A protein has these predicted regions:
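Short alpha-helical transmembrane segments in multi-pass integral membrane proteins
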Residues: 1-19, 76-143, 189-245, 301-366, ...
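Small-residue-rich hydrophobic transmembrane alpha-helices
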Residues: 48-108, 145-159, 163-164, 262, ...
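Transmembrane helical elements of multi-pass membrane transporters/channels
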Residues: 17-36, 137, 171, 204-208, ...
């Protein structure tokens, strides 16, 4: 199968062809997350709060899977661009093996730490029990989830975005169909409550993996997994982790941030914790088109950088930035005009809706400028500069927002936390542009 189209097709249609399947698959995944939350919210607001408290650890596990997958993705794309298929095959094989190892470790460790973790944020035994029930079942499927995301990045690296789209859609549709049956019961199937939501999630992930395995076994691809390729290769493994670890941290930092913000907001009311959890559900949906474009850009940047097509790398960055900013402008408009209805999808509590309406209208002020940070971070990962990408994420999720949120919370109460979001995005955008420009100049003039 020929992969040279990634350096020969015109940039704009190429980026769209790579991004659109990502956007569709992420849209379906986000719709699943929202539908899943809607079903859980029908159990009780306590159930919704339990999911909000579990979110940081669940997000961290996904960060490990996706972040290391970025390392796999970039290395495969770089080697294919340079015409080295043997190293591309070895990258895919080693990447899958390490992903499965990560899954086994997470499957053992995460259930063990959850009771203590949840007890740090609430003394409500019902909330802790719900959170433990949900997380224990979800983490039993971690090995499957790790394999899913490794395959996703492998297919994306070779330009087969449509396969990832079909696999994810199949899993999400299965999940959505199973949610009401397993949560509320149907016929001989008993009502499992929050445990049913977790089980539906795991089954959906298994369906996705089945699709990937079927396509992999029946389709010719530029890269193949091969057991003999698993012989020790410290240099290659080091490259996978050199990109993967910063990418993992990039994605895990929001979990650290949510944990920190939960500790600030819980001092006022559990309603604020619930609002923060709902915001992150909505944020996933609002950011997904821009994130889909960045995901489509990343392997193209890696491939063209490997092929020394530096002018195309610059065009890809500028085009992605413009498209992302336009999309985030639409997200800003939605949050300013229909924040109340958006919140009412997840709760009927008037106090929670009022708090959420204010939060969305303040936080969204930083959406447009955040396009600079997300685009720069994705482009740097594509260039193999994981540490530079990590600097941007540290600014967004630790260095700026944590002290700003703490200071403003002390002066303005919970509203100060919401203001910290947009202030941080403005400051981080300036840093991101300052980090990316020298990197782009360096790779254009080696």
């Amino acid at each position: 199968m020929n992969d040279t189209f990634m350096k020969t097709r015109p940039v704009f249609p190429l980026l769209l062809s790579m991004a659109l399947p990502n956007v569709i698959s992420m849209l379906v995944n986000s719709l699943y997350n929202i539908v899943d939350s809607l079903f859980v919210a029908r159990i009780s607001e306590q159930a919704m709060t339990a999911l909000s408290l579990v979110y940081p650890i669940q997000n961290f596990v996904n960060a490990v899977a996706i972040g290391f997958g970025v390392g796999i993705n970039v290395q495969i794309a770089l080697y294919l661009g340079a015409g080295d298929r043997e190293q591309a095959n070895r990258s895919a094989t080693h990447g899958m093996a390490f992903s499965l190892l990560h899954g086994v470790l997470a499957m053992i460790l995460c259930p063990a730490i959850m009771p203590g973790f949840l007890a740090r944020f609430t003394d409500d035994s019902t909330l802790v029990s719900m959170g433990v029930t949900y997380s224990t079942i979800v983490f039993l499927f971690t090995l499957v989830n790790m394999a899913d995301l490794a395959f996703e990045k492998i297919f994306q690296a070779v330009g087969r975005m449509n396969v990832s789209m079909v696999a994810l859609v199949a899993g999400c549709v299965s999940n959505i169909m199973l949610d009401p049956i397993l949560i509320f019961g149907l016929g001989p199937v008993p009502a499992l409550g929050i445990a049913g939501a977790a089980l539906a999630t795991g089954i959906g992930q298994a369906v996705t993996l089945c699709v990937y395995l079927y396509v992999y076994c029946t389709t010719e691809l530029p890269v193949r997994l091969s057991f003999p390729q698993l012989r020790p290769d410290a240099a290659l493994d080091g490259k996978l982790y050199a990109i993967g670890i910063p990418a993992i941290l990039n994605l895990a930092l929001p979990s650290l941030l949510v944990t920190f913000l939960n500790s600030l907001l819980a001092a006022f009311s559990q309603s604020y914790v619930t609002v923060l959890g709902i915001y992150y559900k909505l944020q996933t949906f609002l950011y997904l088109p821009a994130n889909g474009i960045v995901q489509g850009m990343r392997p193209l940047v890696g491939y063209n950088y490997g092929a020394k097509e530096h002018g195309r790398v610059a065009k890809l960055y500028n085009l992605t930035l413009g498209l992302s900013a336009g999309i985030m402008a639409i997200g800003t408009l939605l949050c300013l005009t229909v924040s109340g209805p958006l919140m009412s999808l997840f709760t009927s509590n008037p106090e929670t809706i009022a708090i959420g309406r204010t939060a969305l209208r303040i936080i969204c002020l930083g959406f447009i400028v955040s396009a600079v940070s997300t685009t720069s971070s994705g482009a740097l990962e594509g260039l193999g500069k994981g540490m530079s990408s990590l600097v941007i994420s540290l600014c967004r999720y630790v260095i700026f927002i944590m002290p700003i949120a703490w200071l403003l919370c002390g002066r303005m109460g919970p509203t100060g936390v919401w203001h910290a979001f947009w202030i941080t995005e403005v400051l981080s955008a300036a840093i991101a542009y300052g980090v990316y420009c020298p990197a782009q100049c360096a790779q254009s003039n080696p």
